[in-house]
Amino acid sequence: MAEQTTLARPYAKAVFELTKDAKTRNTWSKRLQALGTVAADDQVAALVGNPRVSREQLIGLLLDAVGEDTLGQEGKNLVQLLADNGRLGLLPEIAALYEHLRAEAEGVVDVQVTSASKLTKEQQDQIAGALKKRLGRKVRLHCRTDEALIGGALIQAGDLTIDGSVRGKLARLSSAMAH
């Protein structure tokens, strides 16, 4: 995973440096998300790694699946470049890194909130408000549930992790009692 990130980062940065305004960033987000989704498909990933499938066939497959209108000439150029360098398998990682760069530039932090039960809109707003105040940036919440947490929530924003789950509290209590 770390190796893929290292290989994908220069491509994501290069694409990001092409974008000068929000409209262009949004266009590239759509392009990269579409390409990343197609490239992440198990069947497509198997073809990308198959030496019997030519570079031209892979390019054609991606262009057909995503649509040349969606990609535009710059998107086609990226696909060609990645194919030439044997890096089409990096598309999902490139898309993720691009979104991270975009969020940073726009002063937004993506936050993963995992809770034991579904959060209400009011709870989501309360968490977002508290995190915005603490981090000093706009917050974009991504919520999911995991009943294994028993209660509470686990919040992850970049390197920051706040474990307010019952499972986490029990683990810390158990660890403290063992020492």
UniProtKB/Swiss-Prot annotation:
HAMAP family annotated for this entry?
Answer: ATP_synth_delta_bact
Q: Which organism is it from?
A: Alkalilimnicola ehrlichii (strain ATCC BAA-1101 / DSM 17681 / MLHE-1)
Q: What keywords tag this UniProt record?
A: ATP synthesis, Cell inner membrane, Cell membrane, CF(1), Hydrogen ion transport, Ion transport, Membrane, Transport
| UniProt subcellular location | Cell inner membrane
Recorded protein name is ATP synthase subunit delta
Any one Gene Ontology cellular component term annotated for this protein? proton-transporting ATP synthase complex
Q: What SUPFAM superfamilies has UniProt attached to this entry?
A: N-terminal domain of the delta subunit of the F1F0-ATP synthase (SSF47928)
Outline what the protein does: F(1)F(0) ATP synthase produces ATP from ADP in the presence of a proton or sodium gradient. F-type ATPases consist of two structural domains, F(1) containing the extramembraneous catalytic core and F(0) containing the membrane proton channel, linked together by a central stalk and a peripheral stalk. During catalysis, ATP synthesis in the catalytic domain of F(1) is coupled via a rotary mechanism of the central stalk subunits to proton translocation. This protein is part of the stalk that links CF(0) to CF(1). It either transmits conformational changes from CF(0) to CF(1) or is implicated in proton conduction.
The Swiss-Prot or TrEMBL record describes its family as follows:
Belongs to the ATPase delta chain family.
Q: Which gene encodes it?
A: atpH
The UniProt GO MF terms for this protein read: proton-transporting ATP synthase activity, rotational mechanism
Superkingdom, natural source:
Bacteria
Tell me the subunit arrangement: F-type ATPases have 2 components, F(1) - the catalytic core - and F(0) - the membrane proton channel. F(1) has five subunits: alpha(3), beta(3), gamma(1), delta(1), epsilon(1). F(0) has three main subunits: a(1), b(2) and c(10-14). The alpha and beta chains form an alternating ring which encloses part of the gamma chain. F(1) is attached to F(0) by a central stalk formed by the gamma and epsilon chains, while a peripheral stalk is formed by the delta and b chains.
What is the protein's membrane topology class? Answer: Peripheral membrane protein
Cytoplasm: present as a keyword of the record?
no
